């Protein structure tokens, strides 16, 4: 249903946010932005 669809989308978004956060963190640490 709608709820499981929303959960799936939420997981996808959370994963993308986590990945981009990690990327910007790596960039700040290593200094190659």
Swiss-Prot record:
The keyword Disulfide bond applies. GO terms for cellular component: extracellular region. It comes from the Eukaryota. Disulfide bonds join 27-33. Expressed by the skin glands. Coiled coil: none annotated. Transmembrane segments: none annotated. Its main location: secreted. It is found in: Secreted. Keywords: Amphibian defense peptide, Antibiotic, Antimicrobial, Disulfide bond, Secreted. InterPro entries: Antimicrobial_frog_2. GO terms for biological process: defense response to bacterium. The keyword Nucleotide-binding does not apply. Belongs to the frog skin active peptide (FSAP) family. Ranatuerin subfamily. Antibacterial activity against Gram-positive bacterium S.aureus and Gram-negative bacterium E.coli. No activity against C.albicans. This is Ranatuerin-1T.
């Amino acid at each position: 249903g709608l709820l499981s669809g929303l959960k799936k989308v939420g997981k996808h978004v959370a994963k993308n946010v986590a990945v981009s956060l990690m990327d910007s963190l790596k960039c700040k640490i290593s200094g190659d932005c």
